[in-house]
Amino acid sequence: PAGQEKRYAAEVEVLSARSRAVVREPVETLLVGSSIFRLWSSAATDLRDADLVNHGFGGSRTWELVEYVEELVVDFSPEVVVCYCGSNDVNAGASAAAIARRVEIFMKTVEDALPGVGIVYVAINRAPQKRDRWAIVDEANQRIEKACRKGPNRVFVDVNEGLFDARDSPRTELYLEDGLHFRPAAYREVFGPAVRNAIERVRASSRG
C-alpha cells in the first residue's frame, strides 16, 4: 500500500545473496513468508528436503511478499513455492479482503513469471494471541482458499485442525509464551506432515 515503509530491504538482500551462494539448481521447494517460516529452523528435516530454500523474512506482511517476489522467489525458479503470510496483516488491522487480494496478486505474479510452478499456501493460524480477531483470520483463509481453487497448481493447506484439540481449543503447548509463534513440536507434528502432503499434491497436479 502507498506510504508503507520498506522495512526489510537489507534483510532481503542478505537472504537472497546467501541463498544464491549455496543453493543447488534447480530449486525444488522454496518457502517464503513471515516469521512463522523464518523461525522454522527444522524445515529441511520436517519436510524431508535437504536442499530446501527457506526465505521467511522479518515480520513481513502480504504487501511485502509482493514487493520482494522477484528477489526471494522468481530469481530462484523453484518448482514449488510454499507461502505463509497474513498474520502480521491481521495484527496491523488489515481487512480479510485486502489480505486475500494481496495473496492472490502474489500467486499470480509467481505463476506469470514461472509457468507450471506449484503453489502451496499455508493457512493463517488461529493463534491464541489473535483470539479477538479469529473472525478476520477465518474470513481471510476462506477467501484465500477460494483463490487457490482458481489455479490448477495451487493447494491451500489448513494447519489449524492440528493446532486445536478435541474441545476446539488451541493446543497452547505448541505455542511460545507470546501465543503467536511456535515451539519445535508444532512444526514437527503439524506443519511438517500437512505441508509435505500438500507439496506432494501440488507436484502431482503440476505433472498433470
Residues covered by each model-derived region:
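Catalytic His-Asp segment of secreted/periplasmic serine-dependent ester chemistry enzymes
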Residues: R126-G208
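A short helix->loop->beta-strand "cap" motif at the edges of active sites that frequently abuts
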Residues: L114-G118
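Cell-envelope and extracellular/periplasmic
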Residues: H55-G58, V80-A94, E104, K108-E111, ...
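Conserved beta-strand scaffold positions in the cores of enzyme catalytic domains, especially
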Residues: L31, L52-N54, F156
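N-terminal secretory targeting modules
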Residues: P1-L31, F37, S41-R48, K150, ...
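Structural beta-sheet core signal
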Residues: L31, C83, V120-V122
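Charged helix-capping and loop-helix junction motifs
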Residues: A96-F106, W134-N141
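Oxyanion-hole/transition-state-stabilizing segment in secreted/luminal serine hydrolases
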Residues: F37-V53, T62-A100, I124-P128
